[in-house]
């Protein structure tokens, strides 16, 4: 399959911004796994630490997981898993004392950042999701739209 060809050593780096538009690269590797491409991570701050989720390109349903107290130095933890087929490509956010992970066409929630329960989702690929102050959710994603006639 296409993921069999994923080779290399892509690593997680970081950048900071004061305005969300202009970013400055922060020197240093935040997280790496030897002989694994780590791409498209999702990070979230929850219960006093940072949680980092990275798609495992070779194993659907499994994601690499690391945590950090300072958001700069991540330590690998046990991989996270969901019960159905899905890729840990997406967005993590916190609401109602849980982390919600909105993955590519799936969603999962966790009370502790380690144990996950999957939920039905109708979102498209790689969504960005935020929980709003009025207790509603805003999701931005894309879908191919056939030409309009």
Which sequence ranges carry the predicted segments?
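Beta-rich carbohydrate-recognition and catalytic domains
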Residues: 1-40, 44-149
